[in-house]
Amino acid sequence: ASTSRPAANPSPPRRTAAVETGPMIYFANDHHGRRDREYRFNYKKVGNSWRAYILRTPSLEGRAPDAAITHKLYDNGKPYVCWNCDVATLKEMQTISKFWADNIQEYIATGKRFG
């Protein structure tokens, strides 16, 4: 005769910290009346640092798109926000990317560089 045993309770799923978000939208501050203020980012943890991959920005309206001027780096052709040190948390990277977007918005309107 076989004895039946109750199914073992599976371990609860382990919660791991997210390493990537889906696309997130930020509407930059604009003091010049520009209509297009939409920026889209995908945040991803790479190694020990968070990155803000740039999915969309408004047109630069003829301003120089150079990576050094617009503070962008590239990972396999995908642009992300350049920052001078590792970023430990998603929240910090979101704050940095908003700062970046607000400064790009000013650059588009006036040509004023930042950094």
Regions found by a protein language model. Give the residues of each.
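Charge-rich, low-complexity N-terminal segments
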Residues: 1-19
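Long, contiguous binding/interaction regions
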Residues: 5, 35-38, 99, 115
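Compact alpha/beta protein-protein interaction domains typified by the UBC
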Residues: 17-85
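Domain-level detector for trafficking modules
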Residues: 66-115
